[in-house]
Amino acid sequence: MLLTWLHHPILNSRIKLLSVRYLSLTAYMLLAICPIAVRLLELEDYDKRCRCNNQILLNTLPVGTELLKPIAASESCNRQEVLAILKDKGTKCLNPNAQAVRRHINRLFFRLVLDEEQRIYDVVSTNIEFGAWPVPTAYKAFLWKYAKKLNYHYFRLRW
């Protein structure tokens, strides 16, 4: 059997890959399988990329927020992100520079606590560390100033 491809005679009948029918079948299989393989590889790499690329960043916490998840900047995503996990298992992207978001995350680092024995307010560190979030020294200074003001009013009224 003499196969021809591009007007060149091929004498070996066992080489069927060069026939037009098998080439078109091979091309079809590659075109069908390659996008599926690329899609699977993209899904594996999903956690390493930015999650809030094409979403609107909210400046306040949405209603039904269960927890906040700060995400550090990394090699594949060069910006800091904050995800709000909702009670209905949905997620929303928050603006990490918004005042309301920063206030809620800063509350995780330091607390203003009333010492019952001495009856004074004190700022306590919770010793939580996020790689995505620097320890807010300005918020700690604000809490110390507020505690000092509360202690002053308490002791002034007591005497």
Swiss-Prot record:
Pfam families: IL8. It comes from the Viruses. Gene3D superfamilies: 2.40.50.40. CDD domains: Chemokine_CXC. The keyword Disulfide bond applies. GO terms for molecular function: chemokine activity. Belongs to the intercrine alpha (chemokine CxC) family. This is Putative viral CXC chemokine 2. Keywords: Disulfide bond. Disulfide bonds join C50-C77, C52-C93. Transmembrane segments: none annotated. InterPro entries: Chemokine_IL8-like_dom, CXC_Chemokine_domain, Interleukin_8-like_sf. One of its GO terms (biological process) is immune response. GO terms for cellular component: extracellular region.
